[in-house]
Amino acid sequence: MSQESIGKVILLQPADASAKTTDVVEGIISGIMETGEVNVVGLNEAMFLACSAINMSTEIAKVYVDDIDIASLLMPNLGKVAVISAHLSQKQAGDYAALAEKEDKALTDPSEQTISVSRASTMERLLTICLLRLAKFDEVKVVAAGGSINDAITLALKLIGGQISKDPLGIKLFHLHSIIMRNDPTKSIAAVSIYLQKGVTTRYTKRQSELLKKLESGI
């Protein structure tokens, strides 16, 4: 786990995937107390760790997610990687839960438009299911929890990459949240809902664009 400086960036590499969530949370809290803001970036296998640490931080401290995105980057020494990048601060800039609820209400056939990602399904199978649903609907929702988050993000990035989807496709909303664990109602786990829509261009804020460029240049 390395901490670089473009503002404060906690960069979680694939090799960090087995690190303790609380160790990352400690870094987030420290960064927030120092400067009032921190960027958390997870690469490939470490994306779930990043999501878990972000969620825990917002649950135990006055910390809010004001910007969160996923992207596919070409990075030195790592090649093509899937990335999740979030900017955390102490100011609540928007209500992602309300935006997700609005998107859910707009779905015409929620059960058909929702693709649940699990480790039991191959990426090829998931891609095929998504393409079948996109042939019927303009919008689909990809959901996952726990370690399947890595696959869900990879799936979404493959779909918006332009190589396999028949229609131009973009990310309308990325929602990171928590759900109660089925086998232990006293515990929660990170989960994501990724809303993909035809004709939408995936947009990044200026801050995220600059950070992603620096990641590609090997900050």
What is each residue range found by the language model?
Residues 146:
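Conserved strand-helix element at the start of the C-terminal RecA-like helicase core
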